[in-house]
Amino acid sequence: SQAARVQAGVLGPDLENQLRASGLTMRFFLQAWEFSSLGGWIATRAAGHFATVYTQIDDHVESLRVVTPEGLIASRRVPASGAGPNPDRLFLGSEGTLGIITGAALRLFPRPTDVTTAFVAVPSVAAAIDLLSEIQAATGEQASAFELISRFALELVLDHIPNTRDP
């Protein structure tokens, strides 16, 4: 896999802008992405609802650099193993109680070359789930986001965002 070592204080947009130049993306867009840092995502074990496949930061962290009261812990990038506990996993979601995360090696993905946005009306939640399955099958699971919103929420969008059409 492709990976990058990243400092914990980088904000989501800055990280994606740096990756864009290399044709890569993290494909991790949680709701507070614009205003939060990588270290915070790891410390809180963040999950992004603006994603369809890689929804938790766990899916992206390959190794960590953490400062503890005992000193620096720098894990190595190693393949997944069933040979006992993984020390990195202890720090995911620890909220700073075990140490301060200073950096991480992150799993990256090729940036999509084509971007399409669709606003589709479906008759039921079951139909929306079927639609997502069809989209994922047609794109090789490359769809980066899929949201289901209620009619009430749609009415708010139509009332407050000019030039938005009712699907």
Regions found by a protein language model. Give the residues of each.
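Terminal amphipathic helices with adjacent charged low-complexity linkers/tails
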Residues: 144-167
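FAD-binding subdomain of flavoenzyme oxidoreductases
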Residues: 2-147
